[in-house]
């Protein structure tokens, strides 16, 4: 019986272009908050000023569910939030995660070994692969930062630059590329006043008349 050639086996796997899937654990490893911390933040920081009586009642019910130890996603499923209340929840969610995301980015400027994903991608691209697909449910941009540290071009559905517009993959050409598919949206995705979807990089607050396009847990993600 011949001895298994692990190097050849690994090369065969790489040749099949495996998909990398990133869940919340990938972000938690860098100190990003999970659902429990987000739930606490929402209760304490969501702006509920000016809501209607019905919206306020829904908010109180939502907060009580969280205090009763119902998890965030289940709590959001058990209430019917209006478009306005949902917008407030999205804004608070964006504010918290964007701040933590920025902290990780600043740390990465001082430590070029902070992202294990960079090493994985660099290793995978030592094969004949030209494109690697990454699928993530996370709003943060840690996958993008990891690509940058590894000198790997990445595509998230938009053109390059600071103010980015929707683009097909064929519009972005490079010798090798990581496609990052963000199924719940991203911190830098917004609906503009023209009602088109754009991406704006590394901002500390949501611009006036722009709406974050992250999809919070609960019924919103089915819309």
Per-range role (PLM):
Residues 1-223:
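Conserved catalytic-core helix/loop/strand module for nucleotide-ribose chemistry
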